Amino acid sequence: PVCSAMTLSRNGNSIIFSKDLYKEGIRTLEDFKAAIAKTPDKVHTLGMVHSASMHNLLFRYWLAAGGIDPDLDVGLTVIPPPQMVANLKAGNIDGYCSGDPWNSHAVNSGTGVVMARSLDILPGHIEKVLGVTEDWAQKYPQTHLALVKALLEACDYCDDRRNREEVLGLISQEQYI
């Protein structure tokens, strides 16, 4: 079993649909439901980063809230996040749920549009956590505590405006985006 001592982030994901669907007039979940009803022979395929992910949960919750059965009305497929935009552009998927930078890439390249933000679907949802196995946490309690403390110190450092330029310089390097 895995245990978590710390939430690392909340919210931060978006549901992106292809610019082609947008050009067809799909601007809302209601529009998407109507498009599905008008084209019963077409499978609308949507990508997510993993079947055991918040992205899957968000997609399913959002679709179901709009009267779309995620198991019957659309096809859900797992795609690694760095491949989302290319698959959207190629027409392999109609949309996806992911975090940045992939959403920004889709929007900035004109390939996709934001249909929904996770903040609007499930406000305050946990996104990333520090997870360790229970066995490890019990075997190394001081190391576990030191890890949590180090992460909290790093958070404080990143949150300090005096360190803003340095932090931005680090996280905006090409290998991280």
Across the structure, where does each feature detected by a protein language model lie?
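Short, glycine-/small- and polar/acidic-enriched structural segments
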Residues: 1-77, 93-104, 111-124
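Short acidic active-site motifs
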Residues: 83-84, 102
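Second-shell loop/turn segments in exported
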Residues: 45-49, 135, 155-159
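Secondary-structure end/capping motifs
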Residues: 140-177
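A bilobed periplasmic-binding-protein/Venus flytrap-type ligand-binding module shared by bacterial periplasmic
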Residues: 13-25, 126-143, 157
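Hydrophobic residues within well-ordered alpha-helices
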Residues: 87-89
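Short gly/pro-enriched beta-turn/loop segments at secondary-structure junctions
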Residues: 124-125, 166
